[in-house]
């Protein structure tokens, strides 16, 4: 579908808990109401609940109009609710760009619009 919306947006904020996920979910609802296939992506997340899920990732998935696999929506998930680069180091994981780009391109193939939510703040 041809759209006046950009094909991808990056959403960032000045800190954690400032409304990035809330804003992404609101935008996903607007895009869905415009008849667009839209999906959220949080490439790197930290902090999981008892079921091993991240609340931001779950909110993005619930708001999307595309049922994308969790592994594409969130390629890197760390259990500890700390800065992702620290959590990655503690788990011996190196956050690589290639898996993130691969997931992004797979989502772009399924949706008119992809909203990418950054971690923390800048």
Residue ranges and their predicted role:
Residues 100, 104-122:
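Switch II (G3) loop of P-loop NTPases
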Residues 15:
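Conserved glycine-rich cofactor-binding loop
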Residues 18-19:
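Conserved glycine(s) of the Walker
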Residues 11:
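Hydrophobic anchor at the beta1->P-loop junction of P-loop NTPases
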Residues 3-8, 22-94, 98, 103-106:
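N-terminal phosphate/diphosphate-binding loop that engages ATP/GTP or pyrophosphate donors
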């Amino acid at each position: 579908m041809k759209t006046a919306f950009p094909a991808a947006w990056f959403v960032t904020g000045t800190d954690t808990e400032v409304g990035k996920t809330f804003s992404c979910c609101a935008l996903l609802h607007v895009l869905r109401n415009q008849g667009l296939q839209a999906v959220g992506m949080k490439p790197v997340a930290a902090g999981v609940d008892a079921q091993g899920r991240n609340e931001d990732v779950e909110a993005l998935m619930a708001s999307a109009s595309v049922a994308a696999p969790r592994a594409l929506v969130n390629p890197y998930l760390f259990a500890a609710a700390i800065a992702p680069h620290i959590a990655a180091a503690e788990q011996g994981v190196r956050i690589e760009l290639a898996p993130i780009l691969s997931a992004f391109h797979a989502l772009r193939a399924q949706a008119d619009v992809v909203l990418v939510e950054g971690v923390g703040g800048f």
